[in-house]
Amino acid sequence: MKFAVIVFPGSNCDVDCYYAVKDGLGEGVEYVWHQEKNLSKYDVIMLPGGFSYGDYLRAGAIARFSPVMEAVREEAEKGKFIIGICNGFQILTEAGLLPGALRKNEGLKFICKTVSIIVENDKTPFTTRLKKGQEILLPIAHGEGNYYVDDKTLKELKGNNQIVFRYKENINGSVERIAGVINKKGNVLGMMPHPERAYDSLLGNTDGLYILGSIVDNFVKGGV
């Protein structure tokens, strides 16, 4: 299988994603510049963290108009696995591929530390190596990770089991401590924590492999 790591101007976690796939999973992976218009040869698409276009206007607001995003949308409609991490999550919400928005952290400060994450849904292609209620440790590094949805959308997320991860504690003001959500179809995941920074014991822990490894497992099984 082959992963695509999308590179926007201002991305800075693309290399982390690349080596997490190459060394952590042992799978094929390529960098894909944001001007690319065809992603059909890739099996999994990763939108990495960083500050695409300098986060001007707001995080992800300009990147959503990059040519590659139309290709991302097309592959999402086909059912391919897509994971947006941190800025990638912000881009997916701006593009309308995931519900909600990411606002400035409640304390208006950039937060960079390892935090406890609770698994809310273990039935997604990204979480089958995990158990509902399981606690894992993942790094976060964001200034705009405060996830917001209105009450109606929150009710829909709960009813459709689209909330995948929550912070164990209130880290940034996110509604109900939400750290990651998935689309209704179940193939597009957005999350603020960084699994690609937790794939080797030298980095502190390997909990990120639960998520990245689940993608491989479910691709082999045949998708969503």
Curated annotation (Swiss-Prot):
Keyword list, A-Z: ATP-binding, Cytoplasm, Glutamine amidotransferase, Hydrolase, Ligase, Nucleotide-binding, Purine biosynthesis
Annotated HAMAP family: PurQ (MF_00421)
Species of origin: Caldanaerobacter subterraneus subsp. tengcongensis (strain DSM 15242 / JCM 11007 / NBRC 100824 / MB4) (Thermoanaerobacter tengcongensis)
Keyword NAD annotated: no
Catalytic activity, reaction form: N(2)-formyl-N(1)-(5-phospho-beta-D-ribosyl)glycinamide + L-glutamine + ATP + H2O = 2-formamido-N(1)-(5-O-phospho-beta-D-ribosyl)acetamidine + L-glutamate + ADP + phosphate + H(+); L-glutamine + H2O = L-glutamate + NH4(+)
Subunit structure: Part of the FGAM synthase complex composed of 1 PurL, 1 PurQ and 2 PurS subunits.
GO cellular component: cytoplasm
Annotated catalytic residues: C86, H194, E196
EC number of this enzyme: 6.3.5.3, 3.5.1.2
Pathway(s) served: Purine metabolism; IMP biosynthesis via de novo pathway; 5-amino-1-(5-phospho-D-ribosyl)imidazole from N(2)-formyl-N(1)-(5-phospho-D-ribosyl)glycinamide: step 1/2
Pfam families linked to this entry: GATase_5
Domain of life: Bacteria
SMART domains for the chain: GATase_5
Xref: CDD domains: GATase1_FGAR_AT
Described purpose of this protein according to its UniProt entry: Part of the phosphoribosylformylglycinamidine synthase complex involved in the purines biosynthetic pathway. Catalyzes the ATP-dependent conversion of formylglycinamide ribonucleotide (FGAR) and glutamine to yield formylglycinamidine ribonucleotide (FGAM) and glutamate. The FGAM synthase complex is composed of three subunits. PurQ produces an ammonia molecule by converting glutamine to glutamate. PurL transfers the ammonia molecule to FGAR to form FGAM in an ATP-dependent manner.
Molecular-function GO terms, alphabetical: ATP binding; glutaminase activity; phosphoribosylformylglycinamidine synthase activity
Protein name per the record: Phosphoribosylformylglycinamidine synthase subunit PurQ
Gene assigned in the entry: purQ
